[in-house]
């Protein structure tokens, strides 16, 4: 009787695990599905031809915006700069 109870519990645990879709890989917070829901966007592909569906609203909350600062480099005019000129070949000449 106890063996039957253990088997039933294990059966329901195994079924509950398979009901949830698999998570996406490579640190993407989403699920692998055949079709994404209306509020989801597909970030990248999953295995077996499925899409990695990410909730767009949740993704915006957790995404941190970083400001990219470009440093302006003043070029020294005393330095010599090299240029390489590549030869070109004209196949057709179009006259208008």
Curated annotation (Swiss-Prot):
Its main location: secreted. It is found in: Secreted. GO terms for biological process: defense response to bacterium; innate immune response. Keywords: Antibiotic, Antimicrobial, Defensin, Disulfide bond, Secreted, Signal. This is Beta-defensin 20. Residues 1-21 form the signal peptide. The keyword Protein transport does not apply. Disulfide bonds join 24-52, 32-46, 36-53. InterPro entries: Beta-defensin, Beta_defensin_dom. Belongs to the beta-defensin family. The keyword Metal-binding does not apply. Has antibacterial activity. GO terms for cellular component: extracellular region.
